[in-house]
From Swiss-Prot:
This is C-hordein. The lineage of its organism: Eukaryota, Viridiplantae, Streptophyta, Embryophyta, Tracheophyta. Developing endosperm. One of its GO terms (molecular function) is nutrient reservoir activity. It comes from Hordeum vulgare subsp. spontaneum. The keyword Aminoacyl-tRNA synthetase does not apply. Transmembrane segments: none annotated. Signal peptide: none annotated. Sulfur-poor seed storage protein.
Amino acid sequence: RQLNPSSQELQSPQQSYLQQPYPQNPYL
C-alpha cells in the first residue's frame, strides 16, 4: 500500500493486496 500512490490504490486495490499481506491491508 505504501509503495503505491493513493490514486493507484483506488484504481486497482488488488495491486496493494498483492504487495502487502491481507490482514495489513486497510482496504480489506
